[in-house]
Amino acid sequence: MKDITFVDLEVTLNTCRVVDIGAVRSDRTPFHENSFDNLLLFLHQVPYIGGHNILKHDLSYLKPQFEKAGCRQPKIIDTLYLSSLLFPEKLHHQLSKDDKLQADKPNNPVNDSLKSLLLFEEEQNAFERLDSMLKMIYYGLLHDTDEFGGFFDYIDYAPDILDDLSGSILKRFDKEICISSPLAELITSYPVELAYGLSLINCWNSSSGIPLWVLHNYPKVGWVMERLRDTPCENNECAYCRGAFNGKEGLKYFFKYDSFRTYEGEDLQQKAVKAAIEGESLLAVFPTGGGKSITFQLPALMSGKRIKGLTVVISPLQSLMKDQVDNLWKNEIMDVVTINGMLDPVERAHAIQRVEEGSVSILYISPESLRSKTIERLLVGRKVVRFVIDEAHCFSAWGQDFRVDYLYIGDFIRLLQEQKGGKQAIPVSCFTATAKQNVIQDIKDYFFEKLNIRFKTFCSGSTRKNLKYKVFKVENEDEKYGLLRSIIEDHDCPAIVYVSRTRTAAKVATRLQQDGNPDENIQSE
């Protein structure tokens, strides 16, 4: 190992004053003293200094000291940038603080320096394990950058620059990125972001998403990923786009179905899926039991596979959320969770962790959850690709009484877009089984007013062929009750009686019991 010394400075948050200094040489010789003069003596003629986030933290304090002493500044190696590149499956990249028994105990800069040194050794081994083409691609992108130049110099890695870096990337990531990606632009303008994006794609089958540190410091990484994997081209020779944006292939891959459901001969389900895949906002009126869940689940799962995108499904009923999640899990589709009041603290914490780490493509929540700071934090930290509003008729006049919090959805989406920079609108899909024109118009008006969204509409117009309707005219409550008893007695089968109030349900149930119906067969809610 070449001579290298890892340094860590402890600085007060309020006054930005250095209160402790630690360092460790590559031969494990430590330094621990709050003295820059003695630190410079310890660093005398060291060709490299390293640290964890040294570029954005420690170096701003060290550089003036080198200049003041007239010393040449050693080359810099930052293990934080390397960790995010070489261990992309990790969500967090901060140094562990397992030596601290108490949270308020000061950090030990010597221990942190040693941890950085040990991490650097792991990073060298990780780079060695990469295939030769990926090594050359990383070198071609990063050897001239402040973040990575010192690393390549330290390990004496200086291959000939690839003549066609774009072509090499396309060859190395064949069928994993679009062949029409603007690689030349990305190489020139966003080399670090492109390197991080390729690193993520290289481990794409892992459960984690884009590391939070990368998202914070290189927000363009998400945009780069979209250019590579989420912008369909029309080139028939692009194997990636032919598969990644093909709804029928996705249907077969995730749900094992060969074809979409039709409505009276119309391919509305397939058309709605295609619109969602293409990033359009849509309003779908499909009958209950008509396959509307798959219509929004499939594009969500496909987006999760492409760019670790998160689709947020807002549903008014906890039981409905649980049922849909359970059904997906039964089909071995595990990248979906719900966060609601039915979960115990352990289940809730686990669901939150999965959303945060990027292993979830579909999140079911209630409209009330949008007021939760935890939910807001989770969504800010993820690439939210779409909001799906189930039972969207709750926006209409009747829905305001049933679920007032539905009226906050538009405000929340606008707030989330602003927190993410406001440059990209998040598409919305609304699903309902209610085909009344005034209800549909209420939904359209709401989203146009709140988010300037114009929906592409898919209306089945189908009726439930397994349901038959009949209307009876009665003059009073006694006549209504008598007719109800006759219907129940004439049909030896389970029945559901709907009334407008819980109290009325209890009264009807009690009266039926008193009139000779078995107690155990009658329930009211």
Residues of each region from the PLM?
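Entry/capping segment at the start of metal-dependent catalytic domains
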Residues: 1-19
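Structural motif
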Residues: 4, 47-50, 310, 386
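Short, glycine/acidic-enriched loop or turn micro-motifs at the edges of active sites
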Residues: 11-13, 55-56, 81, 393, ...
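Interdomain "pre-motor" coupling segment immediately N-terminal to P-loop NTPase/helicase cores
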Residues: 191-245
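Helicase motor core with emphasis on the C-terminal RecA-like subdomain
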Residues: 233, 239-255, 267-271, 277-283, ...
